[in-house]
Regions:
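Residues within alpha-helical segments
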Residues: 34, 98, 109-112, 134
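Hydrophobic/aromatic-lined pockets within catalytic cores
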Residues: 61-64, 95-101, 112, 116, ...
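Conserved small/polar residues in nucleotide/adenosyl-binding loops
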Residues: 133-139
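Acidic interhelical loop/turn segments
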Residues: 64-80
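Extended low-complexity intrinsically disordered regions
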Residues: 1-67
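Short, C-terminally biased terminal segments at protein or domain edges
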Residues: 105, 110-113, 117-132
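An amphipathic alpha-helical micro-motif enriched in hydrophobic residues
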Residues: 50-59, 78-108
Length: 140
C-alpha cells in the first residue's frame, strides 16, 4: 500500500465537504485515522479509551431514545445518527489499536477466529443474550 494514497486534505476549500481518501480496508482506515489523532502522546492509550467510552455511551443513549421516545421504531435519521456515533467509536478503536501497536485487521481476524472456534464448540451463545426482534427496522 502506498502511504501517499492515505494523505488527507482536511484544509481543502471546495464546494464539497472536506476531502479525504476513501478507504477499502481496516488497516488503511487506521492509517488515515492516525493522521487526525491530535492528543498528547503521554496520554496515548488513556485518551482514546476515555473517548471510546464516551462515544459508546452516545450510541447507547440514541438506542435508549428509540425505546423511550420512538416506540421501538428506527427511522432513517436515527440510523444515520447511530452510524455517525459508531464511526466515532471506530476512530477511537483505531487510534487505541495504533497506540498499543496493533493493526485493526489483526484484531478483527483474531476476533473472528475466536468466534468461529466458539461456534464450532457450540459455545457461541453468551450470557444474557438479548433479542432485538421487537425493533422495527427501516426498509431500504
Amino acid at each position: 500500500m502506498n502511504l501517499g494514497q492515505l494523505e488527507l486534505d482536511l484544509g481543502a476549500q471546495s464546494n464539497e465537504s472536506n476531502k479525504y481518501k476513501k478507504v477499502s480496508d481496516l488497516d488503511m482506515y487506521q492509517q488515515v485515522a492516525k493522521q487526525t489523532a491530535i492528543y498528547p502522546r503521554e496520554q496515548a492509550i488513556i485518551y482514546p479509551t476515555l473517548g471510546l467510552t464516551g462515544e459508546a455511551g452516545e450510541v447507547a443513549n440514541k438506542v435508549k431514545k428509540i425505546i423511550r421516545d420512538d416506540g421501538n421504531k428506527i427511522n432513517e435519521g436515527l440510523v444515520q445518527e447511530i452510524s455517525a456515533e459508531i464511526g466515532d467509536c471506530l476512530w477511537y478503536i483505531s487510534v487505541l489499536a495504533d497506540d498499543i501497536g496493533c493493526k485493526l485487521s489483526d484484531i478483527a481476524n483474531a476476533n473472528l477466529e475466536k468466534l468461529a472456534n466458539r461456534k464450532e464448540k457450540g459455545t457461541l451463545h453468551g450470557s444474557g443474550a438479548v433479542s432485538y426482534t421487537h425493533l422495527t427496522l427501516p426498509t431500504n
